[in-house]
C-alpha cells in the first residue's frame, strides 16, 4: 500500500508541476537548454517550487487538504491545452519510449530504490523531531500564529512540508 501510494503521489506531483514549470519557461522564452530532458527537470523544479510557495502562502488562511492538489491538477489540465506545452510533453514521451533501454533501466532503478527506501528504517533524528509533526499540524490546522511559543520545534516552517501536508489525508494519511 505504501509503495503504491508513493508512486501515485509522485505521479500526481509530476502531473501538476511539469506543465506549470513549462508555462514559466515558455513565458520567459527559455531556449538555451540543449537537451529536452534538461528542460523537463528544470520545469519540474520550477513547477514544484511555485506550487510549494503558493501552498505555503495559502496555509496562513486555509488548512492544507487534498483540494490543493486537485485544483493544481485541474489547472494543469487547462495548461495542457497550450500547444507549446503539449508539444514539449509529447516530444518527451516519444523520446522516452523510443529509447526503450533508458526507459526500462529507469523503471528498474526507480522500483529498486523504492523497495530499498520502503524496507529501510528511518534513522534521521529530525524527521521524528519536527518534520512529521509539522506536516501533521499543517494538514489538520494550517499555520497557527504563535505556535512556536509552545515549543521551538513547531516554529520551523517549510514550503516542502506544505506539499506533503496536502497529500496527507484519507487513504494516504501517514503513508508518505
Ranges and model annotations:
Residues 2-3, 36-37, 107, 113-114, ...:
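Generic signal for short, ordered secondary-structure residues
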Residues 97-118:
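Internal/C-terminal transmembrane anchor helices
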Residues 113-176:
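Active-site lumenal/periplasmic loops and adjacent helix-entry segments of GT-C-fold
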Residues 26, 31, 65, 82-83, ...:
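Detector for Asparagine
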Residues 25-29, 103-108, 132-137:
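Short hydrophobic/aromatic-rich motifs at helix boundaries and adjacent loops
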Residues 45, 49, 103-107, 155:
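A generic short alpha-helical patch detector that favors 3-5-residue windows
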Residues 1-94:
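Membrane-embedded, hydrophobic transmembrane alpha-helices
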Amino acid at each position: 500500500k505504501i509503495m503504491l501510494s508513493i508512486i501515485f503521489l509522485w505521479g500526481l506531483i509530476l502531473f501538476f508541476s511539469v506543465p506549470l514549470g513549462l508555462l514559466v519557461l515558455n513565458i520567459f522564452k527559455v531556449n538555451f537548454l540543449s537537451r529536452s530532458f534538461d528542460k523537463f527537470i528544470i520545469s519540474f523544479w520550477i513547477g514544484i517550487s511555485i506550487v510549494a510557495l503558493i501552498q505555503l502562502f495559502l496555509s496562513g488562511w486555509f488548512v492544507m487538504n487534498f483540494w490543493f492538489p486537485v485544483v493544481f491538477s485541474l489547472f494543469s489540465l487547462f495548461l495542457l491545452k497550450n500547444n507549446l506545452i503539449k508539444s514539449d510533453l509529447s516530444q518527451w514521451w516519444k523520446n522516452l519510449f523510443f529509447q526503450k533501454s533508458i526507459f526500462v533501466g529507469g523503471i528498474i532503478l526507480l522500483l529498486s530504490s523504492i523497495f530499498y527506501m520502503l524496507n529501510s528504517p528511518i534513522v534521521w533524528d529530525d524527521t521524528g523531531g519536527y518534520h512529521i509533526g509539522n506536516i501533521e499540524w499543517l494538514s489538520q490546522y494550517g499555520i497557527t500564529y504563535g505556535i512556536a511559543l509552545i515549543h521551538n520545534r513547531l516554529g520551523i516552517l517549510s514550503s516542502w512540508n506544505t506539499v506533503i501536508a496536502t497529500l496527507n489525508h484519507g487513504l494516504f494519511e501517514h503513508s508518505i
